[in-house]
Amino acid sequence: MISEVKQDAKSRMEKSLSVYLSDIDGIRTGRARTSVLNGIVVETYGGRVKLNTISSVSVSDNKTLMIKVWDSNNIGAIKTAIMNSNLGFGISCEATTIRLTVPDMTQDMRKNLVKLLGKISEDCRVSIRNIRRDIMDRLKVMQDSKEISEDDLRVAGVEIQKITDDIMKKVNDAFTSKEKELLHV
């Protein structure tokens, strides 16, 4: 019974961590990275599709991304979607290839991105603490209904806290790493 609750806690916290890591991976750092375009949705074929389903994206060099469009009719829609994303890329087209030039980041841009990173990180921490509180509430209800003893509750609480601390350490490590990457000129 308690092991199921602990497994649920770990699973939910790891999902929060996974979402957090994908969110911060999308923050651009002044270097060309294909993950920056993961969230781009293109209006084409009478609907909305992700950019990577209608093209292939690769890194040409440190400052350039190359998008190979599979259907040349989609070039206009892709350019529009990229411009609307406000990523600040320079865009040039040649036949079925779109080149995106990553502009140099100013110190203000870097500071703003660090603030955004801090907000995303804190949201993740809050989410993890809420999961811990929810799990502890579930354990207390189990103790109140005599499904587990007070000692079991205390031991489970310590184990849940250890899981929480491990996940929080991963969040903090990812934050520190990304912050260094952002501030590196």
Swiss-Prot record:
GO terms for cellular component: cytoplasm. InterPro entries: Ribosome_recyc_fac, Ribosome_recyc_fac_dom, RRF_sf. CDD domains: RRF (cd00520). Pfam families: RRF. GO terms for molecular function: ribosomal large subunit binding. GO terms for biological process: translational termination. Keywords: Cytoplasm, Protein biosynthesis. Its main location: cytoplasm. It is found in: Cytoplasm. Belongs to the RRF family. Responsible for the release of ribosomes from messenger RNA at the termination of protein biosynthesis. May increase the efficiency of translation by recycling ribosomes from one round of translation to another. This is Ribosome-recycling factor. It comes from Ehrlichia chaffeensis (strain ATCC CRL-10679 / Arkansas). The lineage of its organism: Bacteria, Pseudomonadati, Pseudomonadota, Alphaproteobacteria, Rickettsiales.
